[in-house]
Amino acid sequence: MSTSTDWPSLASLLARQPDFDPDAVPVAQARELLADWVTPRVQARSMPAQAEAVGRVLARDVIARLDLPPCDNAAMDGYALCHADLNPEGDTTLPVGGRTLAGDPPATLPPGQAWRIMTGAPMPAGADTVVMQEHVRRHADDSALQGASSQPDGGACPSETITLPAGQKPGQNVRRRGEDIRTGQTALPAGRILSPMDLGVAASQGIVDLPVFDPLKVGVFSTGNELVQSGQPLAAGQIHDSNRPTLLALARSRGFEAIDLGWLPDDPAILTKALASSIDQVDVLLTTGGAAGGDADLLWHVLSQPMHHQGMSLPTEAHAWKLKLRPGRPLVIGRISQTPVFGLPGNPVAALLSFLFVIDAALQKMAGITTPRPLPRIRARAGTAIRKRPGRQELLRVTLCYHESDDLPVALPAGSQSSAQLRSVAEADGIAVLPEDQGPVAQGDRLDVVPLHGLL
């Protein structure tokens, strides 16, 4: 849906990669190349800085209008004073001249006195230090202060004195004006995924509306004669389509607008027409199936031919990669006019993991995210030996067991590791990442695991 025309072909980017081999693409290289290739595809708009903005991507820098804190204030309940009035060798006794609460106007500290102050209250003029109330001895109750507020004229309260020990540090327990945010600085950078804390920062600046990007529109097709939508009867040789619901939900969980484009048979004419007509509805297209290069795998062939839609010729681009990844080896990358197309494997687990480990960074960049969120990782111990040969990255579905006697969880395979076994992902706690150069894993070896809780 973007109107941008300044987008180089993937072929031109690959031409600058002398070591690139489309039949043996490392996962990290694939992820970086795709993120470098795509451009932001979303439009900006203004929306209230309320809870609905959480998860949206900030379109422009938010520049601070106010210092935060707006003035020097107390970080603790206690007594404000001038550090120069203290005896460095022993106890100091000072009369208390008044009291300031949070929200009161600033007072003025008379020389040689202390000032009762509460957390968040503005520091009196002439005071530079706060002593915690737990560190002083009070020599009279504060009944004379009940109901009193800040006294800008420095009016004394002779009924109370305090004694405090030596060792107080100048400036202690004081929050300085602007130490959190300074007027004119970038309070929130563009390209940031807004969090509840970010809304708090905006509110502290008196900001009512925020510039945000529209969610990236991710369209999802399933392809394959063997697929039938859930709820429909199955004929011999058919299966229910699990990929499309999974990818739509995954796209939505990543903050994108997921658009269900339905199912397509293995028919080049139907596939071509559906792909060409969909680019007006979405920012990026995902398909599952038809990526492996078999006789019935048509996506690369369709994307290799020019398309036409509503009387217009649509330029296309197509690349077929074999990733050094298990599961998830085949990947088709293409473009119809200015709309990128990612052809994911047909096996359910391979499609899911290809989304997360290969194309997610590119989708985030298209959504306007300046620094894509990496997948979180934790360390775990292998609960059993794992057979592996160097040469490709392997992703294992694992359950995690926690023991008080061990500082790391134990990772055990979660059922079958077949790329068609979706249930094993549903039962898994995480994905163990075995690097490309990794050989056999011994029981007890440390592993990197991407936890799935909160991710799927």
Regions found by a protein language model. Give the residues of each.
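Helix-rich terminal scaffold detector
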Residues: 1-28, 210-344, 348-354
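Short, low-complexity N-terminal leaders and the immediately following helix N-cap/first helix
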Residues: 1-91, 116, 146, 151-153, ...
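Short, glycine/charged-enriched hinge/interface segments at domain edges or termini
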Residues: 7-22, 80-260, 265, 415-416, ...
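Conserved active-site and cofactor/substrate-binding residues in soluble primary-metabolism enzymes
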Residues: 22-29, 45-48, 52, 76, ...
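Flexible glycine/proline-rich
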Residues: 28-31, 46, 50-51, 60, ...
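Solvent-exposed alpha-helices and their adjacent loops that cap or buttress functional pockets
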Residues: 72-74, 86-89, 106-110, 123-124, ...
